[in-house]
Amino acid sequence: MSYDTRLREARKRAGLTQEELGKLVGCAKTTITGYETGKSEPNMAILSKIMEALKVDANFIFQDEMREHYEYH
């Protein structure tokens, strides 16, 4: 599962809409949509706010990406 799918999953588990999450982290709904569809990536400051709002950590968000990195190196 990619980071964008995990973001969407975590947001839904938190019971938030894209608009609500955007307001919590200071982004537009369209920005959150971009993150969740993989069309854009949040910078570290926004990602930190998203993880705090969704009560998840980087291990949850990026676990597959980290696994793939270590499998290839």
Label each region the model flagged.
Residues 5-24, 49:
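Short basic helix-loop element that most often maps to the first helix and adjoining turn
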Residues 7, 21-22, 32-35, 61:
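Conserved hydrophobic/aromatic packing and binding residues within compact polymer-binding modules
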